Amino acid sequence: EVTQTTTVAALGKWNAALDVSGLKDGTITVTVNGTNDLGAPAEEAGTTFTLTQTKPTVDDSQTSINPTYAVAGAEVKVTATFDKDVTTPTGSTLGTAAINWTAHSDTRTEWVGMVNVEPVADSVKSLTLTLKGFQDAAGNTGVEYRLDNALAITPTLTLEKIGDVNEAGAASVAVNGNSTRFETSDELTIKAVDTDNKEVTQTTTVAALGKWNAALDVSGLKDGTITVTVNGTNDLGAP
């Protein structure tokens, strides 16, 4: 409980300010007591009100972006979940792009919106999700939420042209290329397939500046057109 004293003013009126910030949310019972100068106690008067001061927060476990990785310009879906009913999370962003929420006139625990992925430099691997601008029904402004690496930007791979190969060079065909948004520890898989769908594979890791290279042994493949591909998933799980 909290208590406060005051004195009676002219015409029997009185007033006071109570600090209830340390009390629990819910029903608050307020009473007033006093004894006059003749020692006679007044009958206690009382009332109640509802206290709601806990700020709404984002439920991290139920907040998501779909898909979890995308290229610049793609549209992704943001589902934001809160621990209580809130107003529209106005001003929320993915990176610097504003999220367009589905309009509702009421407060709710879940808000769904769409946003277009902004263009970013090749060195940028992910975007941050920021949720803010929401209030509960009592007018308490929510705690701003920030999630780094919320959306992975799709990495890229290139493969340099490979010249024709004869029997002498088939055991070690050099393949190389470039990449963006991979770490030097990330693994790539290179595959060579002949016209009979027989294949050979080789793994390598990305080197400095996104470059990569490997040597393929295609001596066991059939003469003719050989199709070579490279694939990989970066440390954020984006292929």
Language model regions located:
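Short, solvent-exposed loop/linker segments at the N-terminal edge
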Residues: 65-74, 163-171
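Short, surface-exposed alpha-helix to beta-strand junction/turn motifs within ectodomains of secreted
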Residues: 1-2, 76-103, 132, 184-195
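Flexible, low-complexity linkers/stalks enriched in Thr/Pro that connect modular domains
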Residues: 19, 45-59, 136, 145-160, ...
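Aromatic sugar-binding surface patches on proteins
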Residues: 10-17, 106-116, 208-215
